[in-house]
Amino acid sequence: DQDCLPGWSYFEKYCYKVFQVKKNWEDAEKFCTEEVKDGHLISLHSNEEVEFMTSLAFPILKYDIVWMGLRNFWRDCPWKWSDDAKLDYKAWSDEPNCYGAMTTDYQWLRWNCNDPRYFVCKSPA
């Protein structure tokens, strides 16, 4: 698709890939940065991107939680995406806490960063 690597899917200038291996947040982010140039855990910026992401992840993972690149790196500091993208779209399920993850029903959940979870990597096309 467009300029994505084999096995990656294209959507609006970015490439995405769902990984069916469970890692904690830090290891998943590190994996994404090593897997592809400028790769990171997914950051989401619109309902359309969320719908695309879900159409990609749900057939593979069914109902589950996937890591996304949102975490509060230091206590009392603003939330940010791991790729430094602006937090211009939000879908918190309850209150934001330490780390962000995402389920297949568009809700964002706080989760223990050390829990192994599936994840989606994203990189510029």
Curated annotation (Swiss-Prot):
Transport listed as a keyword: no
PROSITE patterns referenced in this protein's UniProt entry, alphabetically: C_TYPE_LECTIN_1, C_TYPE_LECTIN_2
Span of domain C-type lectin: 11-122
Keywords, ordered alphabetically: Disulfide bond, Hemostasis impairing toxin, Platelet aggregation inhibiting toxin, Secreted, Toxin
GO cellular component: extracellular region
Disulfide bond sites: 4-15, 32-121, 98-113
Tissue expr: Expressed by the venom gland.
InterPro entries (UniProt xref): C-type_lectin-like, C-type_lectin-like/link_sf, C-type_lectin/snaclec_domain, C-type_lectin_CS, CTDL_fold
MF terms (GO), sorted A to Z: toxin activity
Origin superkingdom: Eukaryota
Subcellular localization: Secreted
Coarse class of the protein's main subcellular location: secreted
PANTHER family reported for this sequence: MANNOSE, PHOSPHOLIPASE, LECTIN RECEPTOR RELATED (PTHR22803)
Function text: Inhibits integrin alpha-2/beta-1- (ITGA2/ITGB1) dependent melanoma metastasis.
Subunit structure as annotated in this protein's UniProt entry: Heterodimer of subunits alpha and beta; disulfide-linked.
Protein name per UniProt: Snaclec VP12 subunit B
